[in-house]
């Protein structure tokens, strides 16, 4: 859902992040995750930044793993568990205050044109 984030504060960046499993949300997001994983493989996407985000959640900060094709995997920073995945629009990527080269912008635009950012589950 768009516009439901009341708080999104960029805390900083991580050099490394260890993934430690999944939350119960994984089942609810299996279709979107499948498409995102396919995009990462088919487009040869690489991690370009790992951002720490404070959304004011009781379980703590999130680690947003941003790929150079606009896919963002979101984990709990403390537990390392997967929460969700975004096939992001350009404004969502720009919130991370990272350089968005033309090739990345084009991939994001292509995903949006195909409606991939609208996949609910």
Language-model regions, residue ranges each:
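Ribonuclease/tRNase effector modules and their secretory precursors
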Residues: 1-121
């Amino acid at each position: 859902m768009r516009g439901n984030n009341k708080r999104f504060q960029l805390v900083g960046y991580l050099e490394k992040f260890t993934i430690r499993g999944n939350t119960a949300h994984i089942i609810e997001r299996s279709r979107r995750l499948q498409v995102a994983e396919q995009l990462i493989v088919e487009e040869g996407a690489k991690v370009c930044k790992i951002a720490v985000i404070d959304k004011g959640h009781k379980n703590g900060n999130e680690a947003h793993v941003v790929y150079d094709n606009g896919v963002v995997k979101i984990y709990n920073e403390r537990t390392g568990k997967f929460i969700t995945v975004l096939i992001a629009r350009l404004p969502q990527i720009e919130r991370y205050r990272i350089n968005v080269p033309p090739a990345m912008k084009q991939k994001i635009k292509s995903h949006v044109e195909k409606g991939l950012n609208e996949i609910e589950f």
